[in-house]
């Protein structure tokens, strides 16, 4: 990824075409040729789809980093609303669901942002640790942190990568008109009518959630599985309007893969939701 918030789904990109020119900077003529080279000319080198082929190298295909990957598919059990900015033309409800452009799509598609998902997971993880009487220092190790004073403790990058999830399949964008409540009288607040446009799911709507925990420890894996369980059962809503029933998901299928340096092949567990919940090889994870 490029830029900031790479571990929250931002900055992901893909190079579709590579061209490589080689200069030996130890030679005077080569250094001059590099300085005078016209980068706009594309005829000297044939384009390649892979940087490995373009450089003429061979790389190990196996990623040996220790990490736990969770790929889960959910459906919308209730409307979902993650606030975004106003529409470009200004003819939109007061609050609309967040959308993003994707390659191959003619129009922006609704998404589940990595920042929104991370926020609810962080707060639920803190509640779980407090309930169990465990120190919350683990949260800093997993989610990272920045000390506002920048003196007490150095900042730490998040080891949990949360990707943006595209809300795929057919959805309905319906506008709901609401009125603000006067907290003093309990009645309608004068002149506070507003409209919202959440995403309503259908039986075809799915959301794919991708999580990756790098250098995981057993306790951190257990905490992440508890968060997955709460998302799966709809006990952990995401987005706004949770107090009026929005943002609840229903788990359908999940694949948990653990990569370890000491093992030649990764371990994989699957979770499926039918009439009963089925977890493959659950004993080994325990």
Where are these regions (language model features)?
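Small/polar/charged residue-enriched interaction surfaces, especially the RNA/DNA-contacting tracks
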Residues: 1-286
